[in-house]
Amino acid sequence: MFPMVTEFMNYGQQTVRAARYIGQGFMITLSHANRLPVTIQYPYEKLIISERFRGRIHFEFDKCIACEVCVRVCPIDLPVVDWKLETDIRKKRLLNYSIDFGICIFCGNCVEYCPTNCLSMTEEYELSTYDRHELNYNQIALGRLPMSIIDDYTIRTILNLPEIKT
């Protein structure tokens, strides 16, 4: 008879413990209920990009000396640098520079180690296309400056949102 009573007491203790855990979880859920939502409506509202955001790479053709440091420091040897040696002035002349953003991991090593600072990271992150071959950017496409997200009047950022009155 005693084993049955102890089993019943253990069952009661386990039930109380389970109810306490459920109550604790419910209290945490209720504490998050009166916070403002974190999600945004993406195409119409955009977050403000941080200063160190690693987006699309911007390339300045005139500054590049075709040293290929960017290719050597890239973990996947991604930038394609075509150059020709000018024998009369004994310098390399850059012919073509391209990066395939379908393969790029946006590590930023090429930007960090470039001796002439001809590469920089922009805040542009909308690179989606229907064809993966469109992600192979040459020096002309890499040289385009992105339109700033904050200055675009058609897009509401977190700063321009109307305040919610409670």
From Swiss-Prot:
Cofactor comment text: Binds 2 [4Fe-4S] clusters per subunit.
Enzyme Commission identifier(s): 7.1.1.-
Chief site of localization: plastid
Keywords, alphabetical: 4Fe-4S, Chloroplast, Iron, Iron-sulfur, Membrane, Metal-binding, NAD, NADP, Plastid, Plastoquinone, Quinone, Repeat, Thylakoid, Translocase
PROSITE patterns per UniProt: 4FE4S_FER_1, 4FE4S_FER_2
Main EC class the enzyme belongs to: translocase
Topology with respect to the bilayer: Peripheral membrane protein
Residue sites binding [4Fe-4S] cluster 2 per the record: C74, C104, C107, C110
Catalyzed reaction equations: a plastoquinone + NADH + (n+1) H(+)(in) = a plastoquinol + NAD(+) + n H(+)(out); a plastoquinone + NADPH + (n+1) H(+)(in) = a plastoquinol + NADP(+) + n H(+)(out)
Cofactor: [4Fe-4S] cluster
Family, as annotated: Belongs to the complex I 23 kDa subunit family.
HAMAP family: NDH1_NuoI
Subunit structure and binding partners: NDH is composed of at least 16 different subunits, 5 of which are encoded in the nucleus.
Protein name (database record): NAD(P)H-quinone oxidoreductase subunit I, chloroplastic
Organism: Chamaechaenactis scaposa (Fullstem)
Lineage, uppermost ranks: Eukaryota, Viridiplantae, Streptophyta, Embryophyta, Tracheophyta
